[in-house]
């Protein structure tokens, strides 16, 4: 999970924000550090333990809506957190769909 947080939550997140800035947009990072908007639980599999793979339980929209009202572009890393504060890697397409549905 350390590598996932570094690559998705920091490196790629920052690259996208830089890209947006280069093209006139202002991105705001929603990652595992500041805005923990993805509440998740560990994904269950009957055959094997999937490790730190999660599924979305809930998207917290308050901070997302505030940033959108300020014309900021949310850049969301697909990293959720469970009830025990454990970080979980979630499929980015699933996160995008859940965010769209929650908004």
Segments (PLM) and residue ranges:
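Nucleotide/pyrophosphate-binding catalytic subdomain
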Residues: 1-103
